């Protein structure tokens, strides 16, 4: 006949009170059982100090024989090396050799006209040396050669017709993106 919940109330051991895998499959741990392990808890944090270690286990850096392996004794000459450059300075001392400070490298597709303006006194002295090394016959014919040299050498002005293809595409005067990173869409934004 029909047996309800009243008939199971009298039984002391019911199946619903046991875990599905038996009593040994305690995945999350229960507060009733004490952990009886000689190893420290791996998840324990050592923020507030070192954990207590057993006293009977010898440390590997100090063997029972009394003599060390000598691995850690020779590390002092490496630490006596002095720093030549401050950290984060203009030069990098990663590999141990001093590197002279150089001008930042320009993009390979851009013209290098701005380099003469940025370098400073060195480029000006090079320009003066170049004007002084003109042939002597021209100086006697023209009088003051420096004024004539500056008038004769105009600054290069890039034009669209004289564009070199090795420098990349021709410069554009508008801001329309022709090839966006995500590809073209059917919408056009001007």
Swiss-Prot record:
Monomer. Dimer. Interacts with TPCN1. Nicotinic acid adenine dinucleotide phosphate (NAADP) binding protein required for NAADP-evoked intracellular calcium release. Confers NAADP-sensitivity to the two pore channels (TPCs) complex. Enables NAADP to activate Ca(2+) release from the endoplasmic reticulum through ryanodine receptors. Residues 1-15, 35-44 have a biased composition (Polar residues). The modification N-acetylmethionine is found at residue 1. The keyword Transmembrane helix does not apply. It is found in: Cytoplasm; Nucleus. The modification N6-acetyllysine is found at residue 11. Residues 1-190 are annotated as: Disordered. The modification Phosphoserine is found at residues 30, 45, 69, 97, 144. Keywords: Acetylation, Cytoplasm, Nucleus, Phosphoprotein. GO terms for cellular component: cytoplasm; nucleus. This is Jupiter microtubule associated homolog 2. InterPro entries: JUPITER. Residues 110-129, 138-153 have a biased composition (Basic and acidic residues). Belongs to the JUPITER family. It comes from Mus musculus.
């Amino acid at each position: 006949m029909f047996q309800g919940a009243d008939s199971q109330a009298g039984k002391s051991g019911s199946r619903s009170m046991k875990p599905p895998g038996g009593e040994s499959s305690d995945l999350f741990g229960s507060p009733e059982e004490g952990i009886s392990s000689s190893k420290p808890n791996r998840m324990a944090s050592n923020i507030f100090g070192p954990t207590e270690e057993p006293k009977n286990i010898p440390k590997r850096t100090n063997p029972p024989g009394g003599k060390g392996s000598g691995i850690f004794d020779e590390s002092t000459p490496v630490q006596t090396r002095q720093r030549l450059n401050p950290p984060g300075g203009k030069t990098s001392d990663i590999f141990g050799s001093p590197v002279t400070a150089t001008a930042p490298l320009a993009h390979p597709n851009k013209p290098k006209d701005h380099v003469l303006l940025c370098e400073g006194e060195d480029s000006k002295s090079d320009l003066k040396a170049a004007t002084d090394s003109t042939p002597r016959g021209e100086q006697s014919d023209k009088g003051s050669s420096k004024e004539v040299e500056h008038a004769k050498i105009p600054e290069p002005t890039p034009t669209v017709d004289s564009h070199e293809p090795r420098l990349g595409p021709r410069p554009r005067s508008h801001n329309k993106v022709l090839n966006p990173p995500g590809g073209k869409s059917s919408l056009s934004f001007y």
